Every structure is written in structure tokens, then in C-alpha cells.
């Protein structure tokens, strides 16, 4: 649970620091974790991409980890999603989505909401960000509890949660893993744990996930 809470603990630290600044004096708002290394031209290339593209709302590079002495792509997500450790927002976009949420799934909630408002989430593949991993850690492996809580706090309905849970269970070919995810999700619902998103935002997120599901399985 501590590891899961740490996922959005960086958001709390970011918001605490942001409150000390007058955002009116900035055009770009960045959230960077302390365990990453940026290239010397990273910030300039981010600024240039915003300046040249008025519809860019969120921009970032690709995350790399050291493996056997080489830096390789940390393939824990698709290459069109800006990962949590290295977010750069156009200020107007950041304010429109209401900032970041201190909850599991925050780094997907922001992307879905900004795209719904017409902004683009852009990954610049030429920008390599080095993640300093804890020795022996494998960030691609997550427990069932993580997924159950993640789907709940993302605001997903039961149908989409069960579909997503089945997808994760199939990856490791475990029916028990599916049962564990669903059990955790249902426990969160029964406890009526507080969500950091509004009812309207839940609808937006569910519609987004439903559209992805339809496009993949029905080609509609």
C-alpha cells in the first residue's frame, strides 16, 4: 500500500511547491520527479514544441532505464502517453483541467480530461529521460490490489473495470488474479471511498475508455 500511495505522493509535493509560485508569470508548468535525468536540451525542446503548436497541452519524452549497462526503453506503457515522472503542461491547459489530482491514476486522468477539452498529449520520442531505478526493482509488475484500486479511483464503471481486469489477468494467465482485482475494486465501491474526480469527469473518463474498447474490438 505504501508503494501505491507513493505513486501520487509526488503530486502532493508538486502542489505544495506550486502554491509558493505565482503561476501568472509562467507559460509552462512542469512536474518532474527527483529520480530522473533530463538531457541538456530537454526544456528548450519542450518550450519550442509548445511555441510551435498552439494545441499542445501536455508534452514529454520517453522513459529509459539502465539494463546491463545500457539505457533501454522502459516499456511499461504505450509510446503515446506522457509518463508521470516528466509532465510539462501548457498553463492554460493545466488550469482548465483543474490541475493534478492526488489519487491513483492521476497521470491518466489528466491526459483524458485535457484531450476532452481539445488539447493534445504529445510524446517527443527523440527526448530520452533516464529513470534511476531502485536496484532489482521491476516496475512492470504490479499486484492485483494496485489494479483494483486504480480502476476504482479512475472512476471506471463495473463493465469497463471487469474488461480491463480480464486483460491484465490474461497477461499472466491467471483466473485468480482476475478475481483479486475485481474483489479489490468491489471492496473500494462498498466502502464508497472518496474519488478526486467529479461525476461529470467520471462520465468523460468512462466514455473515453469505452471508445477505446469499441475501436479495438468492434472497429466502430
Residue positions per predicted region:
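Active-site-proximal specificity loops/subdomain of glycosyltransferases
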Residues: 1-26
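Short, high-confidence coil segments that cap the C-terminus of an alpha-helix
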Residues: 26, 53-56, 119
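Conserved donor NDP-sugar-binding/catalytic core segment of glycosyltransferases
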Residues: 37-73
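Non-catalytic, C-terminal membrane-associated alpha-helical segments of glycosyltransferases
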Residues: 143-220
